Each structure stands twice: as C-alpha cells, then as structure tokens.
C-alpha cells in the first residue's frame, strides 16, 4: 500500500471567541454577555453541555420545492437541551417572502438524544435537498492571546452556561497557560465522519473491507501506538471493534495521522 503522513488543522469557524474570567483546576469561567433581547440583562454565553456532545445528524426530504420532513441519521448523545437546527437556504427564487423562503425545524430531545426533528416551515425554492446542520459535537478550546502558549488547545470535556471543563490528561497547570482575561476561541472538532465523509457518495476515501478499504491510522492518546480505521460502506470501523460505529472518533488538530491506500 501507499502511505502518506498528514494532519488536520482546527476548523476555521469559531463557535465562540472571548475572554476568560478565572481558572480553577481544569475549569475556565467566562464573563456573561448582554442579552440580545434585553441588553440590560446579563446572559450566559454558552448552551449547557453543547460543546461536549456527540453531534446528531439528519437528512431533509424535499417535495415540490418544500422541505417536507427531516429524517434522523444519527441521534447523537449528551444533549441537555434541544439543539438548534440549521437548514441551508433555498437555491432558487428571488423573494425571501414569496418563492425563496427558508425552511425552519425544531428538535426534540429525550434521554440526551435527538429523538425527533419537526418541520414547522417547509420553505419554498428548494430544487435540491438542503444540508441540515444540528448544533453540538465535540469542541476544542484554544488560546489565541499573544503569549508563549498561544495556540495551545484542549478538548472540552463538559460545559455549563458560563464555564467549560477541559480534558487535561497530562495534568498540566492550566493557571500558567490561561491567565485572567486571556482571549480564547472555541471551535468544533473534526471527526472521522466530518473530515472524510459519513457514507458514500460523500466519502473522500475508498470503502471496502479490512483488506480492500483505504485506512486511517490515528495516534492513541498519550501513546506512540496508532489505531487503524476504515469505512465498510455503511460506517467507519475501528480494527478490533468492527461492530461499533467509529464515525464520531475525534481527529486531533495538528497531530500526524497516516493514510494508507
């Protein structure tokens, strides 16, 4: 096989950019923000738990230019509240009130999973099936302050409305990395599915069985060992655990991994 060593950077779009108030152990506390509806009222900057979920996925169905329903492909997990559903805008029409109307949907959560997505406005002007984006998924927090530690990042383990808890597997002293009022960004993490595609025809690598499919070798946490993954045409699989769907395996930024084909 042909091998190539590559890496994936952080996603470019930031879910949040702001300053921290304080650090305690692995917990970073943030300032409240003016509420959008009432600027005199302080509001928390985050939705509780949303930065540490397994993101749900869904596909829209379109009939006669309208989004008629949304089918859940994966329920996700870890949701404390219903996530926001974003449906991409229509591709035809000229008037946003007549023939180019955005579709709107809302999610229901039960047992920390997205169990239903209800279309409350089908929209108009959809000649194709629009992409449905569901809020959530794993996130990284990165220091963007001009500092010797600039660029350091950590996976978010959990979050409340104004606090995040970082995964600190090396037991670093975060007080020395994140100082009061330091500027940070929170960005979505890549997963095998979001980086290489969840299923055909969107896959960027060849699917197949353990011997015929392209492989992705990801480094194990705090180890020099690499674990092999491949797509079998249905889902991503991890060698040694073929019954499990590995599509939501996190791909760490700026860490080398190996592609074999």
Where do the PLM segments sit?
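Short, low-complexity cationic-aromatic patches
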Residues: 77, 124, 200-221, 242-254
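Short, solvent-exposed secondary-structure boundary/capping segments
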Residues: 28-30, 69-70, 115-117, 158-174
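Boundary/junction segments of secreted and surface-exposed precursor proteins
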Residues: 1-17, 25
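Short beta-strand-centered aromatic/proline hotspots
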Residues: 18-23, 106, 149-166
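Extended low-complexity, serine/threonine- and proline-enriched intrinsically disordered segments
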Residues: 43-49, 87, 135-145, 203-222
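Conserved, function-critical positions that sit in or immediately flank catalytic
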Residues: 24-29, 33, 37-137, 147
